[in-house]
């Protein structure tokens, strides 16, 4: 009987080692395939945003931009990683929860958009060369301050500019793939 327990224990251990190795290989292969899957992920983000774009852009009565050139400059520069990470977090934790409060249809589409953004963030984090961050972005802080000052209108402004954010993501990741 003790030998069958030892054998079972060894089999469980070997299965765990094999699963761990397969997961590592899967993660490595998903990182090598990330540059080719990125355009598809960005298309999905744009398609999900298109379902709420008109609603939020019609409600946005402000002429100023929330997502400015200084933010794009951070995305292109050495702060790109941090700017991207902070902006994803900003949209997921501050903007989208407020955006969901505009009816069940809007909530459903904003939820879908949020899930796609979470998937992108997860893929970026798995592939460390795309999201190895340390420093804070001043441009993101400016966006957050402007968003807060706008109060209720901030959600319309931030959501109406989500397509600009997708373009900034694309710029950041494209820059990283060229390095």
From Swiss-Prot:
Residues spanning the signal sequence: 1-19
This protein's UniProt keywords: Cytokine, Disulfide bond, Glycoprotein, Secreted, Signal
One annotated Gene Ontology cellular component of this protein: extracellular space
GO biological process: immune response; negative regulation of B cell proliferation; negative regulation of cytokine production involved in immune response; negative regulation of inflammatory response; negative regulation of interleukin-6 production; negative regulation of membrane protein ectodomain proteolysis; positive regulation of B cell apoptotic process; positive regulation of cytokine production
List of glycosylated residues: 135
Disulfide bonds: 31-127, 81-133
PROSITE patterns, A to Z: INTERLEUKIN_10
InterPro entries: 4_helix_cytokine-like_core, IL-10, IL-10/19/20/24/26, IL-10_CS
Location within or outside the cell: Secreted
The organism's place on the tree of life at top rank: Eukaryota
A GO MF term: cytokine activity
Similarity field: Belongs to the IL-10 family.
Assembly, per entry: Homodimer. Interacts with IL10RA and IL10RB.
Function: Major immune regulatory cytokine that acts on many cells of the immune system where it has profound anti-inflammatory functions, limiting excessive tissue disruption caused by inflammation. Mechanistically, IL10 binds to its heterotetrameric receptor comprising IL10RA and IL10RB leading to JAK1 and STAT2-mediated phosphorylation of STAT3. In turn, STAT3 translocates to the nucleus where it drives expression of anti-inflammatory mediators.
Protein name: Interleukin-10
Encoding gene per record: IL10
């Amino acid at each position: 009987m003790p030998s069958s327990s030892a054998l079972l224990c060894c089999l469980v251990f070997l299965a765990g080692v094999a699963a761990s190795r397969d997961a590592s290989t899967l993660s490595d292969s998903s990182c090598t395939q990330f540059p080719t899957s990125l355009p598809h992920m960005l298309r999905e983000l744009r398609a999900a945003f298109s379902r709420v774009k008109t609603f939020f852009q019609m409600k946005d009565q402000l002429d100023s931009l929330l997502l400015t050139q200084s933010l794009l400059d951070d995305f292109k520069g050495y702060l790109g990683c941090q700017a991207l990470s902070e902006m994803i977090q900003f949209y997921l934790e501050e903007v989208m929860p407020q955006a969901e409060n505009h009816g069940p249809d809007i909530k459903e589409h904003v939820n879908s958009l949020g899930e796609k953004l979470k998937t992108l963030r997860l893929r970026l984090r798995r592939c460390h060369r795309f999201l190895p961050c340390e420093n804070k972005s001043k441009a993101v802080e400016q966006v957050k301050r402007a968003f807060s000052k706008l109060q209720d209108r901030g959600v319309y402004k931030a959501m109406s500019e989500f397509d600009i954010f997708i373009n900034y993501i694309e710029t950041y990741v494209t820059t990283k793939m060229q390095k």
